[in-house]
C-alpha cells in the first residue's frame, strides 16, 4: 500500500484523493438512504463546515489503524505462510475486523442480524476502500471514508 503524501508526491496524492471522493460519493448517498430507512430519519442536521472538519478524525484514524497498521501486521504474519495471497488476505481480514466492530452491541442481541448487516456493509463500504488503498494509496481510502462521514454527519446520522 502506498502513502504518496509521505513521499511528497503531491500529484499522485491529489489524484488518489479525487478518486476516493468520486468512488465514495455515490456510496455516501446510498449510505444516507440506508440509514434513513433503517433508523427512520435523521437525528439533527449538522452545520456543513463542522461536518467537513468532524469527518476528518474518523476517516484518518480508522484508515490508519485498520487499513494501514492492522493490514500491515496481518501481512507480516500471513506472508510467512501464504506470500502470494498475503496482501489481499490480510487486507480482507483487516476490513472485516473494522466492519464488524461497528456491530458489537448487535452481536450480543441478534448475532445473525449482525452477521448479515456486517456482510452487506463490507460489500458496499468495506471492499471499495480496500481496493482503493491497495491500488491507489491510503489517501484514496481516507478520502472515501471521509466523504461517507461528511454525508452522514451533515444529514444527522
Language-model features, listed with the residues they occupy:
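Juxtamembrane helix-loop-helix connectors linking adjacent transmembrane helices
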Residues: 1-60, 75-81
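Transmembrane helix-loop-helix hairpins at the membrane interface
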Residues: 48-157
Amino acid at each position: 500500500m502506498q502513502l504518496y503524501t509521505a513521499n511528497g508526491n503531491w500529484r499522485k496524492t491529489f489524484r488518489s484523493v479525487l478518486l476516493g471522493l468520486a468512488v465514495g460519493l455515490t456510496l455516501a448517498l446510498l449510505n444516507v438512504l440506508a440509514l434513513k430507512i433503517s433508523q427512520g430519519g435523521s437525528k439533527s442536521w449538522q452545520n456543513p463546515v463542522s461536518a467537513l472538519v468532524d469527518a476528518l478524525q474518523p476517516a484518518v484514524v480508522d484508515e490508519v489503524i485498520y487499513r494501514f497498521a492492522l493490514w500491515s501486521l496481518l501481512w507480516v504474519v500471513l506472508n510467512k505462510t501464504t506470500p502470494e495471497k498475503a496482501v489481499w488476505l490480510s487486507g480482507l481480514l483487516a476490513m472485516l475486523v473494522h466492519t464488524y466492530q461497528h456491530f458489537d452491541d448487535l452481536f450480543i442481541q441478534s448475532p445473525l442480524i449482525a452477521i448479515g448487516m456486517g456482510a452487506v456493509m463490507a460489500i458496499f463500504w468495506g471492499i471499495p476502500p480496500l481496493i482503493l488503498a491497495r491500488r491507489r494509496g491510503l489517501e484514496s481510502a481516507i478520502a472515501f471514508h471521509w466523504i461517507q462521514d461528511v454525508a452522514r454527519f451533515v444529514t444527522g446520522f
